[in-house]
Amino acid sequence: MPRLTPRLPALLLALALPGVLRAQDKPPEVKFIVPAGAAATLPFSPAVRVGYMLYLAGQIGTDSTGRLVPGGIEAETRQTLTNIKRVLDANGSGMDRVVRCLVMLADIAEWGTMNGVYVTFFPGPKPARSAFGASGLALSARVEIECTATVR
């Protein structure tokens, strides 16, 4: 009678491997996030989750009524980052999970003032970031910030 014992692990691996490979090849789930009460007329999703990554659309310093907060770059930056924090928190993430930000400024000369507020929202390690001057931000905003984060 032939002895099969040494071949058994190889046989089991050969049978199981295709299923394991198929499970790993499955693309991550994509979820378009539009919170209740968000304007249905917007031509974009405020956030998109792909697997464990959360991609936020650019945020500006609007309050709950959709109006830009008064007070210039400092107030707008604070409100913008508060809006970002709200989206992150609502989607299983947080400011400590942000890995990248893109900052657009209506006037690059306001970079220092924006940065003074920005760092208060990231007291620990800072995410990777790019910043540049841009004209024509929505609602004549002074700043717009877009972020990418991981989800807990």
Predicted regions and their residues:
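Bacterial N-terminal signal peptides that target proteins for export
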Residues: M1-P9
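N-terminal presequence-like segments and the immediate start of the first folded domain
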Residues: L8, L12-T82, R86-R100, M104-R152
